[in-house]
């Protein structure tokens, strides 16, 4: 079973990594193509394109200028430890053992507007480029056109390498939109996490993001390979709803927040 999650806008390059192991991103030629295009934009253009403040636009213009594909632990950090935010709070990779990282490296992928697909231990230099950004490029009007079917092909390769055909989608719609479902040689399992609010179960973004991270953590810590085991997920009060679920859509409910 292979999992995919979204990246995060917030990055942490200050905290020392809890593992010294690292790998190199596999698709840097494509990343470099995007960087070369981003370098042509002024901070004002970046601000307008990405709807960023002047300060953040300037920061990312500097990031694009200093980005280079010679990644080392001195100028980059493992992706799973560099990303912060709700998903990564739930995932809590800082508490992983070396065996946890080894399992995650095989069974977890992060989708990225700049890097396409990242493995947990892939070194990553800081950036801001959300998948939904309408960055016109040689392949089309946006990043979905830029990546085309590549991401699906790379996920197929990862599935083939582990001899499996199950993809657990824990990514947002924005990011999983870059995956061509019909091109995937896999059974796709989607997930929903709902919390009780005003008498109804609803998807509450903050909680749902954190729950997706907790589900990824559950799979890693339990060394889960059979999707049937996903139904036993019960972190922080969530429980599987057979009534609301289907064969390829697993729904988890929670009656009260526990965090």
Curated annotation (Swiss-Prot):
This is UPF0246 protein PSPA7_1607. Belongs to the UPF0246 family. One of its GO terms (biological process) is response to hydroperoxide. One of its GO terms (cellular component) is cytosol. It comes from the Bacteria. It comes from Pseudomonas paraeruginosa (strain DSM 24068 / PA7). Pfam families: H2O2_YaaD (PF03883). InterPro entries: YaaA. Signal peptide: none annotated.
């Amino acid at each position: 079973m292979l999992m995919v999650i979204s990246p995060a806008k917030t990055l942490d390059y200050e905290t020392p990594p809890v593992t010294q192991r690292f790998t190199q991103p596999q698709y840097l030629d494509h990343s470099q193509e995007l960087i070369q295009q981003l370098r042509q934009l002024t901070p004002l253009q970046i601000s307008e394109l990405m709807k960023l403040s002047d300060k953040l636009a300037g920061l990312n213009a500097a990031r694009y200028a200093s980005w280079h594909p010679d990644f080392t632990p001195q100028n980059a950090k493992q992706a799973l430890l560099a990303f912060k935010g709700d998903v990564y709070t739930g995932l809590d990779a800082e508490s992983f053992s070396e065996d946890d990282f080894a399992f995650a490296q095989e069974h977890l992928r992060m989708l990225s507007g700049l890097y396409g697909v990242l493995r947990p231990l892939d070194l990553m230099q800081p950036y801001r480029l959300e998948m939904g950004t309408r960055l016109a490029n040689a392949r089309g009007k946006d990043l979905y056109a830029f990546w085309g079917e590549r991401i699906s092909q790379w996920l197929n390769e990862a599935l083939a390498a582990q001899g499996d055909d199950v993809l657990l989608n824990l990514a947002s719609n924005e990011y999983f939109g870059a995956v061509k479902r019909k091109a995937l040689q896999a059974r796709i399992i989607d997930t929903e996490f709902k919390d009780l609010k005003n008498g109804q179960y609803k998807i509450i973004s903050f909680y749902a993001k954190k729950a997706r991270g907790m589900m990824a953590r559950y799979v890693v810590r339990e060394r889960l390979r059979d999707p049937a085991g996903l139904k036993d997920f019960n972190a922080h009060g969530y429980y599987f709803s057979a009534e609301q679920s289907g064969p390829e859509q697993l729904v988890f409910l929670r009656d009260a927040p526990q965090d």
